[in-house]
Amino acid sequence: MRADRRASEALDQHRREADEQGWSVVEVGGGGRRALPFAHTVGLDRSGHPELLLSGRGRPEAEVLLGSLADEVLAGRRFHVGDVLRSGPWPPLLLLRVSAPEALVAAQAMRGSDEPVAALQVVWADDAERWPWDPAWVTSAQEQQLFARAPKVAEPRTFT
């Protein structure tokens, strides 16, 4: 009962933030032996844009990165599957369609509909600009869980 109340209060807080600024970032604990913590936006769905999900980055970095991308969406930018973003202090970022939208529990609850919420995963490259599905990808203390399928062709569109 106490956990349900905390979850409800947290959802209300994210709803207020989304009402005020158009989005909020929700952090989700790993919750399983192999699951890693991740973060996702709530509120972008209201503007007709998929929510954004990021795994493998710490809380402050996830909030800054997702918040920056969310602000771009609210300013009129639209992100698409296959876009590669190269800006700011981050490594190249590839956007993929989330194939497990049930992971975005808060976004689904805010949507208030049984229709799965659409989302894009912000996948980050390693220092050599390789993606996690590349056998040469260098893992470090930071690993990312994929909520999307790796592309069959590694020829994404690049945007700055």
Predicted feature residues:
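Acidic, proline/glycine-rich low-complexity IDRs
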Residues: 1-33, 44-47, 56-160
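A short, structured beta-strand/loop element
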Residues: 38-42
